[in-house]
């Protein structure tokens, strides 16, 4: 039996404020297998980002456990790559110096780390941009830099929290196709949060739908569309059927 990269077992999480108690997640269980691309959708406040924060060790669940590669680590920090919604590029550092941060944290010599990073620039469409600064980059290019920095952490599993949410439609479609090519080439495991149901279907092997707060698993749907994916699939009947089914689960009339 294949060991999951990530396994959530009966996860519950509640936040306590001065005047309110906010239940974020309730009894959430699912697995992500090696090489899978899993997208997560749900209404705002359904606990999607909380799930990622728990997975990377920024928060701890009130109930349940999270396994990484079949183990129960005491500390989950650094075991998976995590890219939050904002790119968090440091404006005073060049593109190359921004993506070298994971190597600096690990104490890897700069000459070695520069070589490893530069070898990946062409795969991420960043060749000839290594000496530019974030202020000179488009939104799509900034996301490529942020994703390369996450990639260079060297983890087999990546958590991407709405990485394309702030981009225009054309740039978003371009980066969807680019991400799929990189994912397939390097055989990573990806969990991807999005509010865009079409994007969720287009990218995924499997879509997980979270209910409104507190977030529970409302539906898991396998996406049996052929790979490699192409944008023309969006107009095909089976794609539309999958999108309408997910929108119905989210309570959206179509």
Stretches found by the model and what they are:
Residues 166-169, 243-254:
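Extended, non-globular alpha-helical segments
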Residues 212-245:
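Conserved beta-strand-loop-alpha-helix hinge in the C-terminal portion
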Residues 3-198, 203:
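ABC family nucleotide-binding domain
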Residues 14, 226-229, 252:
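Active-site/binding-pocket entry motifs
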Residues 203-209:
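Conserved catalytic segment of ABC-fold P-loop ATPases
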């Amino acid at each position: 039996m294949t060991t999951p990269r990530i396994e959530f077992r009966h996860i519950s999480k509640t936040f306590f404020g001065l005047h309110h108690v906010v239940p974020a997640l309730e009894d959430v269980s699912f697995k992500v297998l090696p090489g899978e691309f899993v997208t997560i959708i749900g209404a705002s406040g359904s606990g999607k980002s909380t799930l990622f924060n728990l997975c990377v060790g920024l928060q701890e669940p009130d109930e349940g456990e999270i396994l990484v590669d079949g183990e129960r680590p005491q500390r989950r920090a650094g075991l998976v790559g995590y890219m939050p919604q904002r790119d968090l590029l440091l404006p005073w550092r060049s593109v190359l110096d921004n993506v070298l941060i994971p190597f600096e944290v690990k104490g890897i010599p700069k000459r070695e780390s520069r070589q490893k990073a530069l070898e990946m620039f062409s795969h991420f469409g960043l060749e000839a941009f290594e000496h530019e600064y974030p202020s000179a980059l488009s939104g799509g290019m900034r996301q490529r830099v942020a994703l390369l920095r996450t990639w260079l952490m060297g983890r087999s599993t990546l958590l991407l929290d709405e990485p394309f949410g702030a981009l225009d439609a054309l740039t978003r479609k371009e980066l969807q196709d680019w991400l799929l090519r990189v994912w397939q080439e390097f055989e990573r495991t990806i969990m991807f949060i999005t509010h865009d149901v079409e994007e969720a279907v287009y990218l995924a092997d499997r879509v997980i739908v979270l209910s409104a707060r507190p977030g529970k698993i409302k539906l898991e749907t396998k996406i049996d569309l052929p790979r490699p994916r192409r944008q023309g699939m969006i107009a095909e009947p089976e794609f539309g059927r999958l999108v309408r089914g997910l929108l119905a689960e989210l309570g959206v009339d179509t």
